[in-house]
Amino acid sequence: KQIEGVRTFHGMAALPDFLAASRFLVCLLPLTGDTRDILNRDTLGRLMPGGHVINVARGGHLVDDDLLALLDSGHLAGATLDVFRTEPLPVEHPFWRHPRITVTPHTSARTLRDETIAQIAGKILAMERGEAVAGVVDPSKGY
């Protein structure tokens, strides 16, 4: 895709060039077989020196030891992490103590009780009537 005045990248073949031109990397990917462990030493090591990674997607994207090594080597300046392989993040995990890692609480929104009850009840009634239900996850897509 071409956008005037914007450098665009597409597909895995363009990923190395994209990373080399990036100071910040924000992961918003679904967790699939193709994206598991995508935030690894090779991928993160291609970011510009002094880069920063932000993961608000899924903990399975990040290889913890690779991130720690790149932070400790000075290649990466920092990381902001909202999701982890094990949640809640164990108290003894090094992410809590690392000076270049910011851990944020994984809460995107507060659940509103009355609205949630109405939504669930509405979906049950739609299913009983044989109607399509919105928001159904398709496991064949991997997310």
Feature-to-residue mapping (PLM):
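Rossmann-like adenosine-cofactor binding region
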Residues: 1-94
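C-terminal helix-to-coil terminal segments
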Residues: 87-143
